[in-house]
Amino acid sequence: MSNEQNLTEEQISEFKEAFSLFDKDGDGSITTKELGIVMRSLGQNPTEAELQDMVNEVDADGNGTIDFPEFLAMMARKMKDVDSEEEIREAFKVFDKDGNGIISAAELRHVMTNLGEKLTDEEVDEMIREADVDGDGVIDYSEFVKMMLSK
């Protein structure tokens, strides 16, 4: 099995374990039915069409089921998404100068000015308002994540 996804041996064996939880009959492939059973046991309630879409998304050979290499490729892709989460966290720290977990208008103005963006108070307030879901006048981490992911 080639490891083009740069996964560690440990990750591969964890994914193998997860795969066998899905692969109820142990035939080496996950059907939409098996996927549904696991999803429901995790408190999800996917429709038949959603399950089919999920399988189709990773079913590289088009045989209607997910085999282990396809499962591995899907997990590796998900792991890459985690990197972007780390990048968002780093970006948040840049703005959150005092490290109190929120970005104030002053912090936002400071960073934007350092980036060469001369903004008026109104423009800074507008940026805060756009990202400030709960209306408390500052941007917390979850609001920052939402803003970054909606770009």
UniProtKB/Swiss-Prot annotation:
Disulfide-linked positions: none
Residue sites binding Ca(2+) 1 per the record: 23, 25, 27, 29, 34
Binding-site positions, Ca(2+) 2: 59, 61, 63, 65, 70
Alphabetical list of SMART domains matching this protein: EFh
Residues that bind Ca(2+) 4: 132, 134, 136, 143
Domain EF-hand: 10-45, 46-81, 83-118, 119-151
PROSITE patterns referenced in this protein's UniProt entry, alphabetically: EF_HAND_1 (PS00018), EF_HAND_2 (PS50222)
Domain of life: Eukaryota
Keyword Repeat belongs to the record: yes
Keywords: Calcium, Metal-binding, Repeat
Family the UniProt entry places it in: Belongs to the calmodulin family.
More info: This protein has four functional calcium-binding sites.
Cited function: Calmodulin mediates the control of a large number of enzymes, ion channels and other proteins by Ca(2+). Among the enzymes to be stimulated by the calmodulin-Ca(2+) complex are a number of protein kinases and phosphatases.
Name this polypeptide is given: Calmodulin
Organism, as annotated: Pneumocystis carinii
Lineage: Eukaryota, Fungi, Dikarya, Ascomycota, Taphrinomycotina
